[in-house]
Amino acid sequence: NFYLSIVNPAFEELKSELKKHGRTVEVYTERRDFASIIVQFEGEEELDYSIEVMLYPGLAFPRPVVHFTEWASSRRLRVEGLFRTGIQDYDISDITKDEIIEHFLNEYRNLSSQHNKRIDFKS
């Protein structure tokens, strides 16, 4: 199972590292088609990152989704992304734990730098 063998271990590793930096982290992995990790700092949500699997005939396509609150307007935004650029000829069997971690960290760094809350993660 993609979530049990790839996503959940990635999220647990991220949780452990983020807690070292004073973050409160919740990981939700109960569903078979969705998992999320929510990061808070000083009572405010910094990032809600999830992975959904889109099912198409002959393809199970993993899609990272970021939910966050826009700082200036307080609007709740949803951004759907891709794990890889270029021709999207991959499915859940091609995505690794390290790719999930790297994608999460890139999104987290981008958002945290906008709010001047940078964390120096070991890459």
Where do the protein language model's features map onto the residues?
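Ser/Thr-rich, low-complexity intrinsically disordered terminal regions
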Residues: 23-47
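Arginine residue identity/basic-tract feature
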Residues: 23, 31-32, 63, 75-78, ...
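Glycine-rich, aromatic-bearing surface loops/beta-hairpins
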Residues: 96, 100-123
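Generic alpha-helical propensity signal that fires on short helical segments
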Residues: 20, 25, 43-45, 110, ...
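Intrinsically disordered, low-complexity regulatory segments enriched in Ser/Thr/Pro
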Residues: 38-102
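Contiguous, amphipathic alpha-helical segments that mediate oligomerization or scaffolding
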Residues: 1-25
